[in-house]
UniProtKB/Swiss-Prot annotation:
Protein name as annotated: Triosephosphate isomerase
UniProt entry keywords in alphabetical sequence: Cytoplasm, Gluconeogenesis, Glycolysis, Isomerase
UniProt family annotation: Belongs to the triosephosphate isomerase family.
BP GO annotations: gluconeogenesis; glyceraldehyde-3-phosphate biosynthetic process; glycerol catabolic process; glycolytic process
E.C. designation(s): 5.3.1.1
Pathway: Carbohydrate biosynthesis; gluconeogenesis; Carbohydrate degradation; glycolysis; D-glyceraldehyde 3-phosphate from glycerone phosphate: step 1/1
Length: 255
């Protein structure tokens, strides 16, 4: 059985003081929104580099895991502004996002550098969360499947699929309020799983995930969790997302 992963990507939000305040509010909200953290649901907080040490310390013993949002492919060197795998591992970080569309769009990330970052993460015992997804133009041109397959084929040579998470994030749904229909997200994730031939591989959905759509998303058989952006910044809403109540197939299909 594949694990259920609920990952929050804070992006460039929250100072250390704000991170501590979030956790102070999140823990009781988690208890109040349901019966507490279900043991089969892994919470991952992917926070800015400056918050990593604080969040690792504050969540110690809680069952939550901490993730970074990027890493360099080299272990050390003259790479101003970068962070390496050994630095993250020493802090107690367990996950790292690689290839997010914002990194690709704003910082020139390519499938080649994604591959090198994935290898670096695994080399140091980190579990990478590989982000893939199509633009609105590619979707409208019927290129969704071929584009994503190309991303996977270029990013994954030499990568151990046993220590990997994939997040399907349609670019047109990130931060726009537009959510990919749950059934369509399920279809694309099923295609990813089939292409890789890895039934054990956890595959998440990301793109305007919020409390109002989490139950329907998690009712889909191929979706193993979510990568949450803006909604993960609010402790009450993120607690509700973690404590989703998956709809029955009939309810999920209802208009």
């Amino acid at each position: 059985m594949r694990p259920i992963l609920i990952a929050g990507n804070w992006k460039m939000h929250k100072t250390q003081a704000e991170a501590r305040q979030f956790l102070r509010e999140f823990r009781p909200a988690l208890q109040a929104s349901s019966a507490g953290v279900r043991p089969q649901r892994q919470i991952i907080l992917c926070v800015p580099f400056t918050d990593l040490a604080v969040v690792v310390e504050e969540t110690r013993g809680s069952g939550m895991a901490v993730g970074a949002q990027n890493l360099h492919w080299e272990d050390q060197g003259a790479f101003t502004g970068e962070i390496s795998g050994p630095m993250l591992a020493e802090l107690g970080v367990r996950y790292v996002i690689v290839g997010h569309s914002e990194r690709r769009q704003y910082f020139g990330e390519t499938d080649e550098t994604v591959n090198r970052r994935l290898a670096a993460a695994q080399r140091h015992g980190l579990t990478p969360i590989l982000c893939v997804g199509e633009s609105l133009q590619q979707r409208e041109q019927g290129l969704t499947e071929s584009w994503i397959v190309g991303q996977l084929d270029r990013a994954l040579p030499g990568i151990d699929l046993r220590n990997l998470v994939i997040a399907y994030e349609p670019i047109w749904a990130i931060g726009t309020g537009k959510t990919c229909a749950a059934a369509e997200a399920n279809r694309v994730i099923g295609l990813i799983r089939q292409h890789l031939g890895a039934d054990h591989l956890p595959i998440l959905y990301g793109g305007s995930v919020k409390a109002s759509n989490i139950d329907e998303l998690m009712a889909q058989p191929q979706i193993d969790g979510v990568l949450v952006g803006g909604a993960s910044l609010d402790p009450q809403e993120f607690a509700r997302i973690v404590n989703f109540q998956a709809l029955t197939p009939a309810a999920a299909a209802a208009p």
